[in-house]
Amino acid sequence: MNLKKTKMIRMGALVTAFTLASIGAATTASAKPSGFPVVDKQKATTLTIHKHVGDEKFGKYAGEQRIEKDPVVGVEFTVTPVLCELDLATSDAWKTISKATVESASSCVDRESKVVKTAEDGSVKIDLPQGIYKVEETKSGNNLVSTKSAPFLVTLPMPKGDNEWVYDVHAYPKNKLTEPGVPTKTASEPTKFVPGAEITWTVKASIPVLQLPYESIVITDQVPAGLTFKEVTSAKIGNETLSAGTDKADYSVANGVITLTPAGLEKVNSAMAKASESMPVEVNLVTTVGMDISTTGATTNKVTLTLNGKESEPGEGTTVWGNLIVNKVNEKKELLDDAVFSIYAGKCEAVTSRSTPVVENLTTKGGVIAQKLYVGKNESDSKDYCLKETAAPAGYVLDPVGRTVTVKAGKDATELIEFENVKVEGPDLPLTGAQGTAIMVATGLLLLAAGAGTVYVARRRNA
C-alpha cells in the first residue's frame, strides 16, 4: 500500500496516516509472495516512542530499528485513540485511513488518552489495544524545545511493505533543542560610598521562543560574602511587566532565587506566541554592602538563568572596594588618640563648606582610623577622596588642610596616610608677672624673719 507524505506545518502539522517520524519495527517477517493476510486480532500490540535530538523526517514505514544518539528525557506524549469505528480487518477501514489526517481523525468518545514520558534512554513503551492512534508531543519536560516533533497517526498493527503486519511498532520523532543564554549583570553606583550602602544590579538575558510552553523559569542571584540580598525592584520579560506581592503574583523571591509562578509563566507563554526568536529579560535587584566587604580585589556577584531545569553558565558583575588607613602622629611620630576626621568624595579643592561628607566623626583609637570606601565597578578603577581633620587631640593644633587620597583597586586596595599634628607650646618669657611677685614676697618674708631673730638674740644678752 502506498502511503502519502504530507506537508508538515509548524505547531500543528497535518500528517497523513502512517507517514510516521522515521518509524521502525521490533520484529520482521520473511517476505511473502501474496498480499496482506487478515489482521490477527488475538495478537497484542505495542508502541515504543524513541525521542532524540535531530532533524525529523517522514516517510514510508520501513520496519527498521535504529540506535539513536542524544536521547531527550522527560518529554510528555499524549496518545489518543481515533477512528474507533473502523475495523482494521476490513478494506473499507484502510480506504478511510489512507485519507485521514491528524486534524480530521476524530477522537473516540468512550476511550481515554494515555499520557507517557520518555525515560533516560529517550524511549517509552506503551501496551495498547489494536486500533488507530494520534500521537502528540504535549510537554517538554526539562528541555528547551525550539522545534517539536509534529503530531502523527499510527495504526497498531502497522503495515510494512506489501504483505506484512508489525505488531510491535517503533516511532522516532525528533526535536531540535536550544540552551539558555548567559545572562549579564551590571552594578549601579551605590547609594553611598561606605558599608551599609545599597547597590542595584541590572540582570539582562534573553529566553528563546519555544514550540512548547515554558514549565519553569528561575533566576538565581548568587550573592557573595560582603553583600546581602535585599529585594527585587522590577522584573520584565518581553513586553510583560511581572508583579510580586499580590494575590496573583507573577514571581516569588527567596534568598535571591526568583521563581516564576504559574501566573507568571502564563504571561510569558502568552507573550511567546507573539514573539519571533527570543524575548528579552530584565530584572533589577538590590544588595546591601556589609562591613565584611572585601578590599582585596573585586567582589564578584554571579547570576544564572534556569529554563525548564536547564541552567545557564553564570553571568557576573563586579564591585570594587578599598581600605583607607590613617595614622595620626605628632612630630616625634608618636601615635595620637582622639583626633576626629571626615571623608569627602572627590579631590579636596572641590570640597566646600556645603559639601556633605561620605563619613564623619571618625575618631582615632590607638592613633589609627580605618575606613572601607567604594572604588568602582572594575579592578582598573580608582576613586579620589578628601580627608579632613575636624578636631585635634588635646594639646595639639588643628590642621585645616585636607589631604586628597586616591584609593585604587587591586589585590591589596589599602591606602596608608600619615596625618601629623603639632603640639601647642609657647616660648619662655621674663618672670614679671604674678610668678615674679610671689618670689619677691617670699624673699621679703625671709628677711623679716631673719631680722626678728637678730633682735631677739640681742635682747637676751642685755637682760
Language model region names:
Residues 2-463:
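Solvent-exposed loop/turn and edge beta-strand elements of beta-rich ligand-binding domains
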